[in-house]
Amino acid sequence: VLVDLPGTAVRREDIEAWEAETGVTISAGDALFLRTGRDVGQSGGYHPSLIPFFKERDIALLGSDVPQEGGQVEGVQAPIHVFTLVSLGVHLFDNLGLEELAQTANELGRWEFMFMASPHAVPHGAGAALNPIAVF
């Protein structure tokens, strides 16, 4: 699911308003992608207050065109990374190129698609470059 909300730290009310507007509901097992508009000079990210929402909706993967962080929690460096990876077991895809995906989604009027990714095998690695594919 692509949520296209550039230029803001996205909070629960933003996602719920987006769901009402698009008719799309983020559900268990979804891969959730946020386009912040980084590549066109805008910025934003997931606000840490969304962490309970991620748990409630039981998402499987979280991605964005930025390193995810749209706000801070006192005493916690990179709260989205810490809480989603460690506490929820959610996979993270940072710094994705989402402009073409957003353009296609807008043209089709569709925000849901099949997502696949093929990472490079890195023995004992904790992260790797990958080839993401969205099929509408």
Task: Identify the residue ranges that each predicted region occupies.
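Active-/binding-site microenvironments in catalytic and ligand-binding cores
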Residues: 1-136
